[in-house]
Each structure stands twice: as C-alpha cells, then as structure tokens.
C-alpha cells in the first residue's frame, strides 16, 4: 500500500485476520483497522460522512470467498452509502469457483495456505459487466486479467485461456458506484 501523505486508509477484515495484522502494524492517525465482516454494514459508519469525501474501495482476494450473494450485497451497500465512490475488485470466474469449491480446491487451499475446511471459493462472475445488472448506477470502467500481458512465469498457461471453459479465470474490474 502506498501512502501519498494525505489519504486515509481503512482496512476491514474479520477479527481473527485483523488481530494477526495488528501484530505487524498499528493504527495511526490516517490508517484505521476495522475488525468486522464486510457483510456487516455497520463498519461503514466508521468512515467519514462528508459529502465531499471521495472513496476508493479495494477488494483484493475477498469476493471469491464471500457467500454467493455477498459481492452483490456489498457492492449495492457501497453504492447506497457512498455514491460516487469507485471500487477495484478481484473476481474469479464461475468455472474457477466450481473447481476451487470442490474437493481438489478445498484441499489445495488447506494444504498450501493453511486455511480451514470452511474457507473456499463461493462466488464468481460469468462476465465483468455482470455487476452493472445488480443495480442502477454501477458502471464498469475497466477490467483486466492476469493473462492479458506476457509474463514468463505464467506464459505457459496462456493457450489454456483461449478455451471457453477457462477463459479469464481471475480478473480485476474497476467500477464507479453512482
């Protein structure tokens, strides 16, 4: 995270994850940690309620783990509470969600990252424009996939992305909310 010397950063995560983070860094005047589920919208009350305030929300490694309707509910909640904000979020395709929510995917998450059996991919998108259908005022501004540019570490996988069933497995999308 890059600090420009003026911005305020609010980090929202589950209490157990926040406790671990606090062992590495503390809150400051401009950095605030909020130990809540993003789906418990009362965390939004801790952010400034100034009509001139501009917000950028970043959801990295979050949406695939939320319940199926979680991303939609959160985006609509942000739209209603912070009109004019932007959201940059990482999404998984429906095919990746099916793969990672099965026995193989759960086992991989458990072995590789030490996650418990109740943590797995639960939600994905078929198309980056899908959130525009959730509510009026959600507008896709940009989207990109990890495979859009050449990188020697993952180039061997690029031919597979031409298969319709794989396509864009993980992608990032930027939206204007309202």
Which sequence ranges carry the predicted segments?
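Alpha-helical subdomain
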Residues: 1-178
């Amino acid at each position: 995270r890059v600090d420009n010397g003026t911005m305020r950063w609010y980090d929202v995560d589950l209490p157990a994850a926040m406790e671990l983070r606090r062992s590495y860094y503390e809150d400051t005047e401009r950095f605030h940690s909020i130990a809540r589920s993003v789906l418990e919208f009362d965390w939004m009350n801790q952010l400034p309620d100034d009509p001139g305030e501009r917000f950028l929300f970043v959801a990295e490694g979050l949406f695939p783990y939320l319940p199926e309707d979680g991303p939609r509910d959160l985006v609509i909640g942000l739209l209603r509470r912070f009109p004019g904000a932007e959201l940059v979020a990482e999404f998984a395709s429906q095919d990746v969600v099916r793969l990672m929510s099965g026995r193989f995917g759960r086992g991989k998450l458990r072995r590789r990252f030490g996650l418990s059996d109740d943590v797995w991919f639960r939600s994905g998108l078929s198309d980056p424009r899908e959130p525009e259908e959730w509510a009026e005022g959600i507008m896709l501004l940009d989207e990109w996939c990890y495979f859009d540019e050449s990188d020697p570490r993952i180039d061997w996988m690029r031919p597979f992305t031409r298969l319709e069933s794989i396509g864009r497995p993980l992608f990032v999308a930027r939206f204007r909310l309202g």
